[in-house]
Amino acid sequence: MNILDKEEFRVKLGQINKLVETQDYKGAMQIVDSIDWRRVKNVRTLCVVGEIYAANKRYEESKEIFLLAYHRAPIGKNILYRLIEVSLKMGQISEATEFFDEYREVAGNDNSQYILKYKIARAKNASLNEQIRILEEYKEKEFTERWSYELAKLYYKAGDKQKCLDLCNEMILWFNDGTYVMKALDLKQRMGVLTGEEKEKYEQRFIPKLIPPEKAQEIRESKEAVSYTHLRAHETAANL
């Protein structure tokens, strides 16, 4: 790049970063497409570009950019992680497996290897028991909301309702609230084992999203009316 090219690149890079901050990945991609990234040496910048392409589901370009970044920084485990994920998105399981082998060489003690191993197993349509075994190994190392819920789902699919219930209860106890706790409550709802308090929490979160607000209010009022009628019936019986 000459001096003018560098200045133009600096301006465009600033625009890209601003668009990424606002999660306008389509807008960012329009600028990204106007630049020859083979001439860029900054690994962080290349990784941002790779993520922009991935966000727009242009996985071929994303993979090419991540490979450029990897060649600039061959010990970058995070780049390898994304190369594995993008390769899986493209259905290139054998390449993902090769990248995974490299990942284990540079990050053999990283618990994330279990997540990657699980994603590869899932892409290979491995048995539910195999997928469960991998996530159980991960859970022994690290207890996280997302992957605990994923494991609970696998238990549910495998028909092991007791393990599913136990794990959902463990998640609710440890994390109390949040996206995956609500998903755990949804699993319990499917099994018909919500407690009274959990049912109230579940309905407050999910019913307004599943049906129009006015219908949700109508259901709540109907339930209140039923409760009131039930209470009055008991009072009447007590006075007889």
How should each PLM-predicted stretch be described?
Residues L4-L13, R38-L46, R72-R82, I93, ...:
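Generic helix N-cap/helix-start motif at coil->alpha-helix transitions
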Residues T22, N56, M90, K124-N125, ...:
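Structural motif corresponding to the intra-repeat A-B loop/turn of tetratricopeptide repeats
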Residues K161-T179, D186-G196, F206-I207:
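TPR/TPR-like (Sel1-like) alpha-helical repeat modules
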Residues T229-T236:
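Conserved small/polar residues in nucleotide/adenosyl-binding loops
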